[in-house]
């Protein structure tokens, strides 16, 4: 039997509340579960009451082979109960093709403007030097 530590939705419409449960992977999301391990209230602001988890029971089920889902693994990582691997997606941080084109155009425009200012500053100096001779 494949066990999952996952979220079971409770609460009413537009007011979600989740229970952290251990359940068979084949059972429905809000269906039968083996044990309730805690809760998550996403509507609360960031405080200690937002996520509540029974650490001893989580350790017990992890030692028995229960696999946490991604969201639950985030909670367990914050609580120091499980280690979440860092994702390596370096292309995600790079700007898109259009943004790169816009940045190149902006850089070229700034360089042209700087060159024009330098040329304008040099022109009166040359005129002054020519009149002084």
Swiss-Prot record:
One of its GO terms (biological process) is translation. Residues 83-101 have a biased composition (Basic and acidic residues). Keywords: Ribonucleoprotein, Ribosomal protein. The keyword DNA-binding does not apply. Residues 83-102 are annotated as: Disordered. One of its GO terms (molecular function) is structural constituent of ribosome. Pfam families: Ribosomal_S16. HAMAP family: Ribosomal_bS16. NCBIfam families: S16. Belongs to the bacterial ribosomal protein bS16 family. This is Small ribosomal subunit protein bS16. The gene is rpsP.
């Amino acid at each position: 039997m494949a066990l999952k530590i996952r979220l079971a939705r409770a609460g009413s419409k537009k007011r979600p509340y989740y229970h952290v449960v251990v359940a068979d992977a084949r059972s429905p999301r809000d269906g039968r579960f083996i044990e309730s391990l805690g809760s998550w209230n996403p509507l609360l602001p960031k405080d200690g009451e937002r996520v509540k988890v029974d650490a001893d029971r989580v350790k017990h089920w992890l030692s028995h082979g229960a696999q946490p889902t991604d969201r639950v693994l985030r909670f367990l990582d914050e609580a120091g109960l499980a280690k979440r691997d860092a994702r390596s997606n370096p292309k995600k941080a790079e700007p898109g093709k259009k943004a790169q084109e816009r940045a190149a155009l902006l850089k070229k425009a700034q360089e042209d403007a700087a060159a024009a200012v330098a040329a304008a500053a040099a022109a009166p100096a040359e005129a002054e030097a020519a009149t002084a001779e």
